[in-house]
Amino acid sequence: MTEPIISFKDFSFQYHSQATPTLQNINVDIYPGEKVLVVGASGSGKSTFANCINGLIPFKTKGNITGELYINNQDATVSCLHDRSNVVGTVLQDTDGQFIGLTAAEDMAFLLENNCVEQDDMKKNVSYWAEKVGMIEHLNHRPQDLSGGQKQRVSLGGILIHRTPILILDEPLANLDPATGHETLRLLNNIHEETKSTMIIVEHRLEESLDDTFDRVLLFKDGKIIANTTPSDLLKSSKLKEAGIREPLYCTALKYAEVDVESIDNLANLRDVCMSEHVKFKVKKWIDETSANNDNKYKSEPLLELNEVCVQYSDYSNSVLNNVQLNVYRREMLSIVGHNGAGKSTLAKAICGFLDITGNIQFCNRGFNQLSISERSEFVGYVMQNPNHMISEKMIYDEVALGLRARGMKESDIKIRVENVLKICGLYAFRNWPIAALSYGQKKRVTIASVLVLNPEIIILDEPTAGQDFYHYNEIMSFLIELNRQGKTIIMITHDMHLLSEYSSRTVVLSKGQVVADTTPVLVLNDKKICEIASLRQTSLFEMAEYIGISEPQKLVQLFINHDRKVRRQ
């Protein structure tokens, strides 16, 4: 019988700063060549599990270990980080933290340079893997000239050059647009087939990541593995709900249509599922018997008006925003989508006054252009995509209280507001923690809390749900809905097709700095041309409709949205 390449035996790990173990009594074997998906809610222990494998624990991050861990038949606790790096390669979630070269080529060649590889061989290796990861045309580009997805591919190429038998990817989809995320998963599958390496992908976005190419799924909850099974069997069980992870939308739709999912052989393969005549009959019957009217209406009173707004970063570059015409209406929840580099974040920064613009911005029929950043912040709050670019305090409480203190509010009033927001964002238990101890997703919630506590008229959130598990996703979105009901206008820049379709009444699509669509979310996702231009990817509901043969897929999507909202309100 094949020996496992990774073996945990009664393994537990506890950080020095915490009162209880983050990993508890882990027993699992992973075999050479397996492709394993590791999922779990934020703080469930999945990243700690990965860091125990790659050696960041205990060689960089200290803590108490009990039990045994063997990597490639070696006791993992007595080797060193250098030796471990020859066996395990890791692509981090935060690509900025992993990019160390001045160009893409230099970054990919870093290991080869340190191993004194001949320059000709070095160039051949870099070119070979750059071709494999789709970066051959970008080898001379600086990191600041690359998108998040491109940086990720550079990091992957640098790891593949080392040809480690184990490859770990931590949240590879977190900062990518849907189409790029789909391409990344396809790339990883091709690499797995070619290299036969053991591949471990840590992710919580099941809609995008889970398919039947995974040999197994490890599901974490509260530091324990509560499921170790095939993708299909996991989807049939109740374990995802127990762990606070959202199942793929098509699985929920099948249940709404009263399909017995436990009787389906390969539930992880949507095409196979939809070949069943019974499934086709049940779904079509559900559509015919249920109204799919769209009750989302945005208000007619403009709050913010952008007229021919342009942004150009230098005299020699093309416009990042090009004659943008856009109205934002009072009390609406607006989603802004588009490919990486489309100008979404630039648009938000232009509204906030971070960038020089040409054109005109009006707020409540008043000129906005002449207001300073500080003055605009009274009306508009902005949560950036990367939390590390916003955080300036060491402690969580102090970070959330920072803006209120700058405005001179009494400390007693600050305490009430800060603690209320921390509870809503699921951070109250960590209020006295150092920010350095938080995961990327938890840091994201801290930055959201630091803006929500200021109570601005308009709240702009750049990827508000990136890195969030389903539980905290719902917590944050429920809070934003409540703010919206109280009269706040919410603008969400997102790659999340769930958020787009379920929580926004209107969607603006950007491509190459221009508005290419401004309509309802369902109509955006039903337009294949718009999806292609903006690097969007239709959800599994659209794929289901096409496989089943439904002539108007938007009916199924709108029906699901309406029905799901009713279920969540109950």
Swiss-Prot record:
Enzyme Commission code(s) on record: 7.-.-.-
Start and end residues of each ABC transporter domain: 6-247, 304-537
Keywords in alphabetical order: ATP-binding, Cell membrane, Membrane, Nucleotide-binding, Repeat, Translocase, Transport
Binding site residues for ATP 2: G338, H339, N340, G341, A342, G343, K344, S345
InterPro entries the UniProt entry points to: AAA+_ATPase, ABC_Co_transporter, ABC_transporter-like_ATP-bd, ABC_transporter-like_CS, ABC_transpr_CbiO/EcfA_su, ECF_ABC_transporter_ATP-bd, P-loop_NTPase
CDD domains for this protein: ABC_cobalt_CbiO_domain1 (cd03225)
Cellular component GO terms, alphabetical: ATP-binding cassette (ABC) transporter complex
Keyword Chloroplast recorded: no
EC class of the enzyme, as a word: translocase
Predominant subcellular localization, coarse grouping: membrane
PROSITE patterns for this protein: ABC_TRANSPORTER_1, ABC_TRANSPORTER_2
Compartment annotation: Cell membrane
Keyword NADP among UniProt keywords: no
A Pfam family per the record: ABC_tran
Single GO term (MF): ATP binding
Function: Probably part of an ABC transporter complex. Responsible for energy coupling to the transport system.
Protein family according to the UniProt entry: Belongs to the ABC transporter superfamily.
Matches recorded under NCBIfam families: PRK13648.1
The protein's name: Putative ABC transporter ATP-binding protein SACOL2708
